[in-house]
């Protein structure tokens, strides 16, 4: 992955979220994706904070968009590796987030670990 590819991924991902376009958001993810986030526990009541599979991810993201109708992200930094990125962004409330995303051979997100400030 190059710097430009990583930024392109980040910009497209943020644009999909800011449009609240669930289909465009999910297009970034593998069917067998795993996402871990403390917000999963908060919104879905899953104690380990883990969502497995694209359909479960769809339900989680839908719940998030319903809970936060004013949701907007601003991407401010992208780190990249050979098959991973870290997207650093803030939301409409100023909460800063860093999401580590491991990419599959096809370039889709296979694993996510979300980390939040404050």
Protein language model features and the residues they cover:
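A beta-strand edge to alpha-helix "cap/lid" segment located at domain peripheries
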Residues: 65-118
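A generic alpha-helix structural signal
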Residues: 10, 58-61, 113
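Short, low-complexity N-terminal intrinsically disordered segments enriched in polar/charged residues
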Residues: 1-27, 31
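Hydrophobic pocket/interface hotspot
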Residues: 13, 25, 33, 53, ...
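A solvent-exposed, acidic/Ser-Thr-rich amphipathic alpha-helical stretch
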Residues: 3, 24, 30-76
């Amino acid at each position: 992955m190059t710097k430009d590819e990583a930024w392109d991924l980040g910009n497209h991902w943020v644009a999909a979220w800011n449009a609240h376009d669930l289909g465009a958001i999910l297009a970034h993810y593998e069917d067998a994706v795993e996402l871990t986030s403390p917000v999963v526990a908060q919104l879905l009541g899953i104690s380990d904070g883990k969502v497995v599979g694209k359909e479960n991810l769809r339900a989680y993201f839908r719940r998030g968009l319903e809970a936060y109708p004013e949701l907007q992200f601003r991407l401010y930094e992208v780190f990249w590796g050979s098959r991973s990125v870290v997207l650093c962004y803030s939301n409409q409330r100023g909460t800063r987030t860093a999401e580590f995303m491991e990419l599959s051979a096809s370039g889709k997100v296979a694993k996510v670990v979300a980390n939040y400030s404050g």
